[in-house]
């Protein structure tokens, strides 16, 4: 079994499912008392979020690249960045850390393609929904077209993420709002929906979505397990 290095803490609420899902995957594959060989570097999300708001993405790239190098020195054999949004600086991490980097959009793209879909809704932070680092990769590498909510909906989705989900708050009102947005995107022709912020899966259970769900945290964790046992 390979040792996986997790870059977490963005927020820590979403890092917990990664650790659980990876260990469950290893136990399911190997049985008995087997558990995952995991190293974790959890950053201070306050610093990362402030850099996001100020547009200081180069600084966040430096922080995460240094964290990845620390995991490499500690014995990690691959890197998993436990957040969708911060894959905006994936290139900065990959350019300085020589370990295999398991990109969340690649794992998600393979899952969508495997389901026979080419047109999906994308929910996440405004950075993930509006910028090209995530949607563009899905289009270029997997020919997947992403539909995103209207501007006012994107603002509300982003607000719920940072003011509720990142703080571990999951309300019925927000759950219903997300379900409403998903239903509207389904009417526009979306075949499935990407939960492109890892805490969304904690808010909206699959049965509340009219579309098949691609929970990126679960997909990414499954990809990590496959890598660890390869």
Regions found by a protein language model. Give the residues of each.
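Non-catalytic structural scaffold of enzyme domains
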Residues: 1-230
